[in-house]
Amino acid sequence: MSLITSTSPHATVKNNTGAFMRQVIYATLPGLAVLTWQFGWGSVINVLWAVIVALVSEALFLKARGRNIAFYLKDYSAVVTAVLLGLALPPTAPWWLTLVGVSFAIIVAKQLYGGLGMNPFNPAMVGYVLLLISFPVAMTQWLAPGEPLSLLQSWQLFTGQLPVDGLSGATPLDTFRTVHSAGASSEIELASHSILHGQFAGLGWEWVNLAFLLGGLYLISRKIITWHIPAGFLAGLGLPALLAWLIDPVRFADPLFQLFSGGAMLGAFFIATDPVSAATSRMGRLVYALLIGVLIWVIRTFGGYPDAVAFSVLLLNLSAPFIDYYTQPRTYGHKSSNRGTN
């Protein structure tokens, strides 16, 4: 009888990088569906175009590096980057805006660092910040929620055949920032604003964030991500908002508004949880995410941008190695958490 032997590892797991990435993509579908329900087909068009741009950009760069294109594209990391950036863009974004952001994210923020696992910053957020700084008007033109455009209208916006000026309006966070900077009562003005209609996070936006919350809980249930970063993120955003609101409810927005408006849930469950650029230890993840949440609240409340998920995530990506150094667990057999010391 002949015995067939193979090299280790002999114990394997069903999941691989591609399988994990596909689960992340599936988890974004509820959020994409609600964005389509509230704003029309613009987000779907953005995501599909972003995926095409990401795959082509990655394939061209892999070919230039002499790498196996099919092998590396199967990990779906480029698709995840494209989906997240496509979801973050306004549904009014023209085709060239997505092209610039996604190609920069894949080529500069990911491949120039060596590819998957080497990038110190979240590629999707690098692309987003580039667009926000370079094209601020195009990046802040959102449609009024609850009045979705048809597929034809969305396509005309995407191709530049339909002007966006008469269709776009301020988001709830834009309204809050304007009211806050003017020194008016956020409680009164936000409640009476035509977009809000008394909703706790702005008409439509609470549903968008609830959908991404549902997708995030799915990722936790499938053990794709752990609870540490989402919990720290939401606590860091919600607790300062609660404290400020209790002190001065006229000036500061309440915590529900902060948690369920803008990209809060997308950031908490899909962006800050990037395993490559985030902190790695359990305590480090909590500290990392807590600081992201606090920074988002500070920039939203006192800064010049209505939302701040991208800036906050990138700043804490930069700090992640420092956080890991001081929060690494104690190695078994050592008294100190610093490896190699007794």
Curated annotation (Swiss-Prot):
Named cofactor requirement(s): FMN
Q: Where in the cell is it found?
A: Cell inner membrane
Name the GO terms of the biological process aspect: electron transport chain; transmembrane transport
Q: Which UniProt keywords apply?
A: Cell inner membrane, Cell membrane, Electron transport, Flavoprotein, FMN, Membrane, Phosphoprotein, Translocase, Transmembrane, Transmembrane helix, Transport
Q: Which residues carry this modification: FMN phosphoryl threonine?
A: T171
Please give the InterPro entries that the UniProt record associates with this protein: NqrB/RnfD (IPR004338), RnfD_bac (IPR011303)
Q: Which residues cross the membrane?
A: 42-62, 68-90, 124-144, 200-220, 227-247, 252-272, 286-306, 308-328
GO cellular component term of the entry, any: plasma membrane
The record gives the membrane topology as: Multi-pass membrane protein
**EC numbers on record:** 7.-.-.-
Give the multimer and partner information. The complex is composed of six subunits: RnfA, RnfB, RnfC, RnfD, RnfE and RnfG.
Entry's family note: Belongs to the NqrB/RnfD family.
Q: Entry's HAMAP family?
A: RsxD_RnfD
Q: Which PANTHER family match?
A: ELECTRON TRANSPORT COMPLEX PROTEIN RNFD, ION-TRANSLOCATING OXIDOREDUCTASE COMPLEX SUBUNIT D
Q: What is the documented function of this protein? A: Part of a membrane-bound complex that couples electron transfer with translocation of ions across the membrane.
- Protein name per its UniProtKB record: Ion-translocating oxidoreductase complex subunit D
| Species this chain originates from | Alcanivorax borkumensis (strain ATCC 700651 / DSM 11573 / NCIMB 13689 / SK2)
